Swiss-Prot record:
EC assignment: 7.1.1.2
Family, as annotated: Belongs to the complex I subunit 4L family.
Catalytic activity of the protein: a ubiquinone + NADH + 5 H(+)(in) = a ubiquinol + NAD(+) + 4 H(+)(out)
Assembly and oligomerization: Core subunit of respiratory chain NADH dehydrogenase (Complex I) which is composed of 45 different subunits.
Segments traversing the membrane: 1-21, 29-49, 61-81
Function: Core subunit of the mitochondrial membrane respiratory chain NADH dehydrogenase (Complex I) which catalyzes electron transfer from NADH through the respiratory chain, using ubiquinone as an electron acceptor. Part of the enzyme membrane arm which is embedded in the lipid bilayer and involved in proton translocation.
Organism classification: Eukaryota, Metazoa, Chordata, Craniata, Vertebrata
MF term (GO), any: NADH dehydrogenase (ubiquinone) activity
Protein name: NADH-ubiquinone oxidoreductase chain 4L
One GO-annotated biological process of the protein: ATP synthesis coupled electron transport
Membrane topology: Multi-pass membrane protein
Amino acid sequence: MSLTYMNILVAFVISLTGLLMYRSHMMSSLLCLEGMMLSLFVMVTITILNTHLTLASMMPIILLVFAACEAALGLALLVMVSNTYGVDYVQNLNLLQC
C-alpha cells in the first residue's frame, strides 16, 4: 500500500473518530461526515485511475452527487433545528419525532 493510500485512509479514520467522539453538536458531525466523504471520493478516484477501469469511471461522480445531497439535507436539518430550538445539539433531533 502506497503512502498516498495510507494518508487518505488516515484522513478517513480521523474523520470517523471525530464523528464518534464529537457527537454533541450537529455542525461538527456534518463536518466529519464531509471529511469522510471527501477522503472516500479521493480514494475511489485514485483507485480507478490506477487500475484503468473505464467502466467504473462514473463511480466518483455518483459518490460526489450523494455527498452533495447529504450535505444539503444535513444543512437543511441544521437550519431547522437551530431555528426551532436555538442550539444545534444532536439530542434535539429526538424531539422532532411525531
